[in-house]
Structure formats: structure tokens, C-alpha cells
Amino acid sequence: IDYACKRQAFGKPLIDHEGVGFMLAQNQIDLKQAELMIDWCASVLDTGALGTTESSMAKVAVSEALFRIADNCVQVMGGTGLSRDTVVEQVFREVRAFRVYDGPTEVHKWSLAKKIKKSHKIANEG
């Protein structure tokens, strides 16, 4: 945010360019959604429930959101965002792995799809 507010391009701060402002707005939205998903999943687990569906949903949503956020930060900073002189490059590298830890995103989505199909079958048997 500091970079986007201070860096000038075409006579105005980067953040005042619609494309950059929209990316930063999306980052804020993604962060809040990730926070809410984590809180929701934790509340389910706090009841003593297994929370397998909820944790899969949260894992996918949060890891995908973090990757989008990091990618947007690199994009806003341009070549500077890929420099090892900034924390953005390190965060980008590290959050990419979140989409693989504890099962890749696709495995969690596949598991959720199987549960959706099973629920549909049960609902339509009666």
C-alpha cells in the first residue's frame, strides 16, 4: 500500500490508477473473506464437530485468496515486487506452497464435490 501511495506513474500515485486501486480493493476483500472463513471454521471445530467439510472449504478459500493477494502485490510493485530486496517476493514464494500443503486445492474440491453428490443422492431418495 505504501508503495502504491508513494510511487508516481503518469503524473499521479499508482493507487489513483483504477487498475491498481481495484487490485488493492480486491486484496482487502480477500483478506476479510479469509478472516471470516477461518473464524467460521474455528467456531465449527470449537463445538467438537469434525469440521471436515468446513476445513476443506476454508483451506481452499484462504490459500487461494492469499495467493491472489500476493500476486496482486507483485503486480502493483512491478519488477520491484520480484526483487529479493522486498518482503513481497518472499511472501509470494511462500504463499504459493499453501495451495499444496495439507492436500492440493484440487483434492479438497474433489472431496467437496463427492460430498455434494452424496447429499444430493440422499435428499432425492425419499
Which positions does each model-derived feature cover?
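Alpha-helical interface subdomain recognition
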Residues: 1-126
